[in-house]
């Protein structure tokens, strides 16, 4: 697929131009709205997911913003979880609030609370299928049933599990948002986000295609679309290795916790807890298998003694990169409390269950023995 860096497009006739600009014919007229390279990526994702429409944006946050802008307006509210990505929380509670849109953050595991929170002014139900970094799994079918009973869409951020490995549509999701910066890009070479629309609410296509793309101006660049089209070609193979590495790593780290306790190692040099939804003793494991199959993603967390221990651990890593991205080909580590949730108060972090003892690991394609050894040496180096 060639990369069309063209900003504008020449037409054969005045009528052709008028038809394109007025939406009577879907054809590229200006690359803020349509671009052949970006459309190729959109069409590929559409074929992979069975979606009615796919829209590619310049980042994951742009995709989230545009999906919510379809439904959010003054006097409306968005019902969502206490557990959300930090920038999504800020978008809802800081940016949208200024325009008269209320956010109601509740425990989505309490289905009665979800029903009670939705009223005649609710625009949508929004969630992450697996929360970051809490690793809480949403019951998509149950929440979709509630949303549809109330006549509102279920919008789900599905970035944590690729759409090639589970069907959000079959679980009742109306609109998926995906940070294509993550698994799809793979090598952290491009930013992007996708809105995947399953057609249950026709207003999505109408507003994004003919309003938001024109007026907001956050369409994906052709270069990013080209890079991510290449990433899609290897997504399945990469994800299988990353998910298997994550499961193997989680199991070995659990064994390390037990061995360290049996050997009475110094408390500061211990992994206190391992959280991964692929582990059979994880409280969300059964639901995760039901929804996502046998693969459980490439994100896990470990808990250490305190923040000082976490910083020491990160500083002593030799193979794993200190970076904020997720689902890169390379393994990454971050301290969420002080970084992606850094701007929030201690009280807000407590409400979101973000602890200063937690390290988030994104497991890459390296040899799993090397990843494990790097974690162990960094833990044992904690003073």
Predicted regions span which residues?
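Positively charged, small/polar-rich N-terminal and surface patches that mediate targeting and assembly
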Residues: 1, 36, 327-329, 333-336
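Short conserved active-site loop signatures built around small residues
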Residues: 1-4, 195
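Glycine-rich beta-alpha junction loops
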Residues: 7-12, 182, 234, 278-282, ...
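Conserved N-terminal alpha-helix of the aminotransferase class I/II PLP-enzyme fold
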Residues: 8-65, 87-96
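PLP-dependent enzyme catalytic core of the Aspartate aminotransferase-like
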Residues: 93, 102, 116, 308, ...
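Conserved small-domain helix->loop->beta segment predominantly found in fold-type I
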Residues: 247-330, 344-352
């Amino acid at each position: 697929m060639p990369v069309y860096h063209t900003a504008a497009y020449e037409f054969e006739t005045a009528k052709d131009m008028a038809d394109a600009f007025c939406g009577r014919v879907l054809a590229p007229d200006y690359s803020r709205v349509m671009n052949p390279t970006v459309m190729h990526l959109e069409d590929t994702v559409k074929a992979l997911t069975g979606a009615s429409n796919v829209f590619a944006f310049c980042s994951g946050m742009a995709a989230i913003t545009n999906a919510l802008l379809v439904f959010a307006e003054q006097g409306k509210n968005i019902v969502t979880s206490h557990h959300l990505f930090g920038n999504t929380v800020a978008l809802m509670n800081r940016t949208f609030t200024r325009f008269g849109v209320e956010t109601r953050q509740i425990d989505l595991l309490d289905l009665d609370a979800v029903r009670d929170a939705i009223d005649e002014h609710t625009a949508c139900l929004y969630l992450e299928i697996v929360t970051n970094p809490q690793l809480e799994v949403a019951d998509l079918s149950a929440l979709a049933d509630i949303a549809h009973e109330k006549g509102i869409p279920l919008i789900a951020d599905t970035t944590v599990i690729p759409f090639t490995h589970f069907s959000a549509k079959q679980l009742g999701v109306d609109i998926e948002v995906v940070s294509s910066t993550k698994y799809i890009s793979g090598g952290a070479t491009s930013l992007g986000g996708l809105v995947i629309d399953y057609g249950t609410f026709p207003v999505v296509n109408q507003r994004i295609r003919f309003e938001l793309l024109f007026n907001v101006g956050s369409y994906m660049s052709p270069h990013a679309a080209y890079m991510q089209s290449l990433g899609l070609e290897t997504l399945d193979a990469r994800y299988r290795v990353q998910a298997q590495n994550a499961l193997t790593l989680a199991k070995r780290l659990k064994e390390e916790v037990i061995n360290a306790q049996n050997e009475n190692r110094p408390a500061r040099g211990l992994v206190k807890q391992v959280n991964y939804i692929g582990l059979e003793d994880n409280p969300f494991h059964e639901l995760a298998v039901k929804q996502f199959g046998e693969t459980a993603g490439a994100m896990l967390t470990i808990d250490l003694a305190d923040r000082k221990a976490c910083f020491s651990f990160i500083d002593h890593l030799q193979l794993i990169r200190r970076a904020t991205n997720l689902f890169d080909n390379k393994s990454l580590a971050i301290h969420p409390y002080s970084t992606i949730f850094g701007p929030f108060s201690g009280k807000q972090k407590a409400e979101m269950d973000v602890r200063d003892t937690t390290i988030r690991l994104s497991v890459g394609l390296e040899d799993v023995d090397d990843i494990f050894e790097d974690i162990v040496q960094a833990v044992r180096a904690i003073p």
